[in-house]
Amino acid sequence: MLILNGKIITWGEPAQILENQAILIRDNRIQEIAAQADLLARFPQEERIDAKDQYVMPGNICAHTHFYGAFSRGMAIPGAPAKDFPEILEKLWWPLDKSLLMEDVRSSALVCLVDAVKHGTTTLIDHHASPGAITGSLDVIAEAVEQAGVRASLC
């Protein structure tokens, strides 16, 4: 696949914004960035995507997330404010985890994955470990990750 007509952000040293360049992608990996005319000449049959003068950059990486936390967005901890992190676990996270059904695990993962894709994140590390973790939940999360078309390390 060739991505054409974009402004390519390299994030290299030094970071650059390249114009009149194209990106060759093979097997879901950037293989080459070169002059657009050169890549078009060398790969005339390659599938093409017109970036229409928009910015193109490598995907972001989220190195720590909890997909099941999607259901706690905006949720207040009941009662008095927690004194410390263990109390937050006891009052919010562990009760939430204990109440999740397998379909809830899948849905919460998909909510987070859609949000990740919308914001340019293509690789995530999800920590799905807590006292009430459902047997087989990592398999369900892995299926959601595959459906979303991103990469993830699940633990």
Task: Please name every model-derived segment.
Residues 1, 60, 122:
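Hydrophobic "anchor" residues on beta-strands that sit immediately upstream
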Residues 2, 11-57:
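Histidine-rich, glycine-flanked metal-binding segment
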Residues 6, 23, 28, 53, ...:
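Divalent metal-coordination and catalytic microenvironments
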Residues 58-70, 128:
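Histidine-centered catalytic micro-motifs
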Residues 61-65, 94-95, 119:
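Single, functionally critical "micro-switch" positions that shape active/binding sites
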Residues 71-105:
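Active-site gating loops and adjacent loop-to-helix segments of metal-dependent hydrolytic enzymes
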Residues 97-155:
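Active-site loop-helix segments enriched in His/Asp/Glu that coordinate
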